[in-house]
């Protein structure tokens, strides 16, 4: 059975059981900074399990794209390890529970996948008698085929929050796959028993003290790895031998000029290339971009590891983008976003390949220098910390370092390397642990929301509202009141204040009541329909139950709205000028300015920036009507409305439509028509990472003031010339030409003076052991000046050894020269290195000429004295 059939059968089966089929969420988790990647099918539904959001439907089924990288070094070397994989799952949010989950799983596996009941084994949590009863008495699984396992394997929990026992379905692959032990069973890791489906029964809430409380609304979270079950149904020894991978691996083999199945080294390389290319293709499509931190570092590491395996098969030219094109061709029907973003994805991969080729060459050069130095020191082992530096700084895999080292007769301190790697992983683990799955504050606010109910936002319609203060928080705890000058968080039944979100900053304003005045410093929405106002008491004191009038500052709200609508115009203009591959990668909308990050492969030319700016201003001049509509997510997508990959939307979405010019899903505040924006001015465009550009801009009076400041600067620039703005470029050009001519005249005079000075130095030449020796300081000379001085000396002397020094702008330079007739005895590189060392520097070079730098100008005279001893010693 092909993977496509398995995927379709699974989704259709659960649809027949009343589940809604949802498309896979992005690999980049929506609104969850604690997670780098969507690593499990339940991740998109975490808010429903934690109670942070209310689901539109209670039964859902998905085939979720997942990415995990903890065991990256195992990929390609084992039958089951992957970075990217697809997870089939069915979920219940307070609807059905164990009986349905278990019986449906058994029905699907045995009747729809056709796996023999005799090959199936079950695990349950140690004391989950309810699950045992269902498996044994309802489904009919013999008791000897049901194994009870402990908390480590069969209980799901991640810190504070919902949790529960697990039950797993295993397939017996046959005794020939086992260890031969009479005790071999599902708990054995020999590989005979393969887990294909994990059923998680979410029935408890774990608090900070480790106590477990039964949940009123229980949940189901199941996961079946598509690649694993495909390997079982297709009767192949590993996931890599399924139709999911073979087409990609065969194509990669064709590009690389090798064959799969004949050589273990080749097979491992092809598996790594296929797996990693799938991962980077899907991740980049979903908005991740190669960089040196976070998700970007993972992408870069995977790409470089795949390239390294290609290099081991003698491929130095970029090729992963070709393999990625095959991934898109194979998976594009199931995941249409792959085809929609294909041009962008493939270009990013190719650019990164070319970039790494340069980095790889730098690493090779560093490794060669390192081995040469170690040889001079009589050592034949590359220290672990230096091997790690090659890996960490240059992306140089340890396997490649070992391979090159062995060719040159070196070994690598692998233990030292592993220690450095483990230290890095330890730091990463600690960093991850600092961000809890569900923090104490999250749990506190969730409980508070359950007590208080939802907060209604009315800020789209009005800027002020009278309501009641229903809670006050200070230092993470509920309090009854706040006194003058105190800060805290206020919760009201209704609010017109827009909370920070979607790149837009929060509203500012005041909360007024009988005997008190609060300044609103910030507004946030930590949970769905739950808004907090961070305030400072300016006058009086405030307590829970007080009546209050919430007043949004209209000026800052309108300025923010102008900038937010302008970002929508800018987004559309970018697509029109640069191409449809452009997508929003981030934004910041404040009352003062806007910042828009977008995906693009290269810098935007001045000409294109002008076009983009013109398109936005033309849309402003047309005074297009800004309309707000509500529709379903499916209808919005069908209508071509722009949606962001890393945002999570409910079934009902808010569409901001600007005439016929633009339509985007957005929850922010906007102007009523584009004419209100007034004027749009781009401040600049820059790179913020591989494949991501940033534009900063101003609107309205801010843009006008900026243009006026430019006019003021131009006016000051014209004053010395007494000319118009139009005449200024020519005047400046003429001035620069005159200055260049004067510079040439000055340079010529300086060379004449230097020549005279250098010739005068020849009077200080002394003779040691028949060699003419000269050491001197050339005042104000940089390295170029020292080279010119040396040319004069060289033309005037024979049988010489020379050491010159210069200090310019606090920087020390040395140059040593040896007559070529004497290079068998004296070495300029040795001499200059010895001198530079005294001045706190270093350098070297050829036997006849070498140069170096120093850090301490006060040591220059002392450094020059080494020449006499050097010549005398030879």
Swiss-Prot record:
The enzyme class is ligase
Keywords for this protein: Aminoacyl-tRNA synthetase, ATP-binding, Cytoplasm, Ligase, Metal-binding, Nucleotide-binding, Protein biosynthesis, RNA-binding, tRNA-binding, Zinc
Swiss-Prot/TrEMBL catalytic activity: tRNA(Ala) + L-alanine + ATP = L-alanyl-tRNA(Ala) + AMP + diphosphate
Positions of Zn(2+) binding:
564, 568, 666, 670
> Cofactor binding mode, per the note?
Binds 1 zinc ion per subunit.
Kindly list the places in or outside the cell where this protein is found, as annotated in its UniProt entry.
Answer: Cytoplasm
Q: What is its EC number?
A: 6.1.1.7
Among the GO biological process terms of this entry, one is: alanyl-tRNA aminoacylation
> Which InterPro entries does the annotation name?
aa-tRNA-synth_II/BPL/LPL, Ala-tRNA-lgiase_IIc, Ala-tRNA-ligase_IIc_anticod-bd, Ala-tRNA-synth_IIc_core, Ala-tRNA-synth_IIc_N, Ala-tRNA_ligase, Ala_tRNA_ligase_euk/bac, DHHA1_dom
A molecular function (GO) held by this record is: transferase activity
- SUPFAM superfamilies per UniProt: Class II aaRS and biotin synthetases, Putative anticodon-binding domain of alanyl-tRNA synthetase (AlaRS), ThrRS/AlaRS common domain, Translation proteins
Question: Which cofactors are required for activity?
Answer: Zn(2+)
A GO CC annotation recorded here is: cytosol
Q: Which Pfam families match?
A: DHHA1, tRNA-synt_2c, tRNA_SAD
Q: Which PANTHER family match?
A: ALANINE--TRNA LIGASE, CYTOPLASMIC (PTHR11777:SF9), ALANYL-TRNA SYNTHETASE (PTHR11777)
Give the record's family classification.
Answer: Belongs to the class-II aminoacyl-tRNA synthetase family.
Its UniProt domain note says: Consists of three domains; the N-terminal catalytic domain, the editing domain and the C-terminal C-Ala domain. The editing domain removes incorrectly charged amino acids, while the C-Ala domain, along with tRNA(Ala), serves as a bridge to cooperatively bring together the editing and aminoacylation centers thus stimulating deacylation of misacylated tRNAs.
**Function field:** Catalyzes the attachment of alanine to tRNA(Ala) in a two-step reaction: alanine is first activated by ATP to form Ala-AMP and then transferred to the acceptor end of tRNA(Ala). Also edits incorrectly charged Ser-tRNA(Ala) and Gly-tRNA(Ala) via its editing domain.
Q: What is this protein called?
A: Alanine--tRNA ligase
In its UniProt entry, the species of origin is given as Carboxydothermus hydrogenoformans (strain ATCC BAA-161 / DSM 6008 / Z-2901)
């Amino acid at each position: 059975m092909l993977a496509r059939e398995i995927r379709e059968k699974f989704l259709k089966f659960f649809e027949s059981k009343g589940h809604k089929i949802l498309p896979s969420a992005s690999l980049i988790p929506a609104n969850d900074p604690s997670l780098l990647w969507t690593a499990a099918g339940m991740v998109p539904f975490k808010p429903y399990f934690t109670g942070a959001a209310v689901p539109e439907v209670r039964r859902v089924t998905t085939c979720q794209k997942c990415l995990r990288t903890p065991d990256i070094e195992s990929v390609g070397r084992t039958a089951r390890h992957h970075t990217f994989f697809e997870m089939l799952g069915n979920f219940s949010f307070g609807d059905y529970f164990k009986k349905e989950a278990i019986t449906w799983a058994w029905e699907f596996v045995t009747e729809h996948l056709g796996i023999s009941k005799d090959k199936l084994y079950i695990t349950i949590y140690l004391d989950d008698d309810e699950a045992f009863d269902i498996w044994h008495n309802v489904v009919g699984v013999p008791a000897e085929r049901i194994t009870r396992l402990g908390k480590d394997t069969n209980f799901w929990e991640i810190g504070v929050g919902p949790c529960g026992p697990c039950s797993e379905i295993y397939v017996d692959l046959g005794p020939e796959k086992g260890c031969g032990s009479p005790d071999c069973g599902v708990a054995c890791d020999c590989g005979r028993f393969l887990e294909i489906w994990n059923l998680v029964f979410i029935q408890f809430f774990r608090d900070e003290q480790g106590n477990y409380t039964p949940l009123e609304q229980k949940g189901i979270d199941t996961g079946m790895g598509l690649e694993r079950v495909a390997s079982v149904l297709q009767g192949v020894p590993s996931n890599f031998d399924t139709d999911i991978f073979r087409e990609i691996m065969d194509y990669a083999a064709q590009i690389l000029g090798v064959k799969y199945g004949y050589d273990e080294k080749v097979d491992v390389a092809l598996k790594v290339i296929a797996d990693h290319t799938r991962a980077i293709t899907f991740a980049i499509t979903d908005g991740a971009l190669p960089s040196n931190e976070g998700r970007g570092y993972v992408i870069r590491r995977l790409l470089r590891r795949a390239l390294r395996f290609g290099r081991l098969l003698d491929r130095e030219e970029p090729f992963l983008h070709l393999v990625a094109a095959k991934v898109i061709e194979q998976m594009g029907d199931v995941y249409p976003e792959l085809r929609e973003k294909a041009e962008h994805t493939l270009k990013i991969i190719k650019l990164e390949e070319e970039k790494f080729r340069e980095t790889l060459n730098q690493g090779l050069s560093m490794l060669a220098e390192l081995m040469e130095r170690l040889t001079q020191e009589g050592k034949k082992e590359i220290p672990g910390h230096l091997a790690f530096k090659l890996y960490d700084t240059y992306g140089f895999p340890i396997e490649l370092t070992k391979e090159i080292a062995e060719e040159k007769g070196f070994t690598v301190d692998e233990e030292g390397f592993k220690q450095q790697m483990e230290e890095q992983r330890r730091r990463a683990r600690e960093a991850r642990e600092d961000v809890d799955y569900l923090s104490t504050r999250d749990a506190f606010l969730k409980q508070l929301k359950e007590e208080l109910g939802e907060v209604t936002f009315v800020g789209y319609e009005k800027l002020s509202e009278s309501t009641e203060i229903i809670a006050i928080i200070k230092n993470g705890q509920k309090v009854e009141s706040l006194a003058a000058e105190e800060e805290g968080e206020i919760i009201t039944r209704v609010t017109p204040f827009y909370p920070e979100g979607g790149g837009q900053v929060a509203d500012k304003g005041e909360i007024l009541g009988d005997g008190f005045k609060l300044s609103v410093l910030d507004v946030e929405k930590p949970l769905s329909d739950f808004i907090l106002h961070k305030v400072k008491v300016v006058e009086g004191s405030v307590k829970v139950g007080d009546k209050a009038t919430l007043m949004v500052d209209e000026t800052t709200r309108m300025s923010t709205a102008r900038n937010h609508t302008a970002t929508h115009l800018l987004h559309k203009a970018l697509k029109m000028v640069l191409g449809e591959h452009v997508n929003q990668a981030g934004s910041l909308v404040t009352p003062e300015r806007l910042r828009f990050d977008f995906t693009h492969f290269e810098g935007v030319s001045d000409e294109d920036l002008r076009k983009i700016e013109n398109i936005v201003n033309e849309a402003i001049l047309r005074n297009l009507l800004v309309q707000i509509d509500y529709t379903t997510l499916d209808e919005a997508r069908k209508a071509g409305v722009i949606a962001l990959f890393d945002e999570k939307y409910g079934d009902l979405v808010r569409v901001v439509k600007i005439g016929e010019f633009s339509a985007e899903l957005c929850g922010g505040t906007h102007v009523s028509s584009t004419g209100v924006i007034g004027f749009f001015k781009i401040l600049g465009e820059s790179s913020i990472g591989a494949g991501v550009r940033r534009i900063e801009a101003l609107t309205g009076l801010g843009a006008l003031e900026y243009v006026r400041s430019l006019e003021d600067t131009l006016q000051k620039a014209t004053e010395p010339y007494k000319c118009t703005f139009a005449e200024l470029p020519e005047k400046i050009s003429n001035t620069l030409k005159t200055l260049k001519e004067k510079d040439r005249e000055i340079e010529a005079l300086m060379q004449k003076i230097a020549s005279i000075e250098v010739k005068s130095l020849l009077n200080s030449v002394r003779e040691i052991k028949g060699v003419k020796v000269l050491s001197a300081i050339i005042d104000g000379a940089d390295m170029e000046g020292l080279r010119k001085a040396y040319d004069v000396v060289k033309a005037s002397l024979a049988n010489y050894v020379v050491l010159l020094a210069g200090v310019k702008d606090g920087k020390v330079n040395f140059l040593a020269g040896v007559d070529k007739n004497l290079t068998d005895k004296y070495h300029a590189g040795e001499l200059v290195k010895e001198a530079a060392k005294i001045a706190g520097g270093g350098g070297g070079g050829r036997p006849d000429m070498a140069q170096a730098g120093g850090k301490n100008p006060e040591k220059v005279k002392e450094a020059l004295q080494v020449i006499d001893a050097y010549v005398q010693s030879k």
